[in-house]
Amino acid sequence: KTYNVAFVSSTNTTVNIPATVADPNNQYTFNVTAIANNSTVPNATSVTMPNTIVRIEANAFKDGNITSITIPQSVKEIQSGAFGQMSYLTAINVDAANPNFRSDNGVLIEKKDSKEWVAAYPLARPDVEYTVPEGVYGVYTNAFQRASYLTKITLPASLKESPSTAEFNGYTSAQNLREIAVAAGNTAFKSVDGVLLSADGKKLIAYPNGKAGSPSTNPAYQGVTGQPNASVYKVPDGVESIEQAAFAQVNGLTAIELNGVKKLAKGAFDKAVKLRNVLLGPSVDTIEDGAFGGNNDLAAFDVDPANPNYAADNGVIYTKNKEELVLFPAGKAGEYTTLPTTKKIRNRAFYYAQKVTKVTFNSNLEIIDNDAFQATTKLANITFEAPAKIKTIGTFAFQGSGLTELNIPASLEVVSWSAFGSTKLKKVTVADGSQLQSINTGAFNGCKDLEEFTFEGSSTLNKIQADAFSGDDKLKSFVIPEKVTVLERGAFNGASGLETITFKQPATMTVIGEGAFQYAKALKRIELPSTVTTISKDAFNTCSS
């Protein structure tokens, strides 16, 4: 039998990846067809790939000292950021017979659907300027990721596409880049003072990461001790939209004057860490979810009172009717209480707000959207004012936050996928009369400090989904409410400290899913209700006690 496998790691200085490997008994042959995501070569000075490799995944060949690499003829796919952790890489070469890729003097170009794209620029290539060859159609997201020495990129007249995500554009994290120039005759883009705009001047596409703004003596722009001097950028006249990730990770600006901008796209200013002054003028009519995030010096937003769409409360942006909390400044410290009129906290509203410590939610709040409080590492406490009306907590809403205790109101109906995953929770209490229907996939996954999860009274809960409590190794006991009929795959997988499981009577449990209690090593005894009809494979695998 033959199987396909991926290269994962080697500690050799010279790494020669084999085309095939066999198991110790020579019963099976494995073709090496991929370089795995986050593959490591900590001691390597060179690596040779066989002509069986068809895919190179993101962050390949991490941690080594490799200066050049050759892509074999067989490679068909190279993921975004594939070489983004190869800090010493100066050249990406390509076998001349490869039909999908070529090298432009060490810069990787992909051939796709009869068009060419800049795919990856070597991080340590010593040139300070690079001119994209004429004929190239586009620049991929992360193409110039972490380019150490580049100060100027010139785009050809042929270039028509420069896509981005909510966190990255094609030039993000090229920290010394100060100018993106555009050749004459380009009908898709133009450059204004080194900043990439659409040809009509209505969209700001990308601001070079290392480009400084203009100095200012305006008292409003001056920082506190330890912060850099004011560096201000005024968006050019005519620009109506700041596109996705246009200022992502930009490190040379402290203030933005939006001028006549109407739209701020998702991630427009993501992790622009030195930004501390933002004024939203009356023209701004659209702020997409997570337009700002991770701006650690930004303590308050200013919104022009004449803006008909948005308003600020103590530096926090709301919709004009005060029903939706749009953005919380990531540098705002301490405690915060949402306005009494608030019904929804938007996607990524508090994203990477790492100075907020406590949030009190008004009783009328109904929805906390996806990623709303993700990575709020100092947020230790949240409180829902009574009578709480909260119904939905979205996907990854508090993932990676600093929460230590949680009281879930009876009104809550949905706890979404990984909503509280990887938090510091120690205790969770669900109120009597709970309307919670399901604890969704991974909702409390990886809560390594979780010791207690309690339902105070009646509950409508009918399902505990896959991996809901997986890896919660300090959880010692759990009482499953009587209306729960299904424990899905791996619900308590890896809850190694779990000693007792109790089914509240009259129990209605019918299905215990695959690996539901796998690696619950401390579980000594469980009394299953008579209603159970299905126990899937590995449900109690490695319950060694």
Residue ranges and their predicted role:
Residues 58-60, 80-82, 141-143, 243-246, ...:
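Consensus positions within tandem repeat domains that build extended binding/scaffold surfaces
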Residues 2-3:
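N-terminal-proximal low-complexity accessory segments that begin disordered
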